[in-house]
Curated annotation (Swiss-Prot):
Organism: Hottentotta judaicus (Black scorpion)
Domain notes: Has the structural arrangement of an alpha-helix connected to a beta-sheet by disulfide bonds (CSalpha/beta).
Protein task: Calcium channel activator. Rapidly and reversibly activates ryanodine receptor 1 (RYR1).
Name under which the protein is recorded: Potassium channel toxin alpha-KTx 9.7
Family, similarity comment: Belongs to the short scorpion toxin superfamily. Potassium channel inhibitor family. Alpha-KTx 09 subfamily.
Length: 28
């Protein structure tokens, strides 16, 4: 999942979307 799709990807998981080196991470 790219950075631009990250917020939508993490939505509903009580997670904070972060992006490192172009990689989406959902930090719970």
């Amino acid at each position: 999942v790219g950075c631009e799709e990250c917020p939508a990807h993490c939505k509903g998981k009580n997670a904070i979307p972060t992006c490192d080196d172009g990689v989406c991470n959902c930090n719970v």
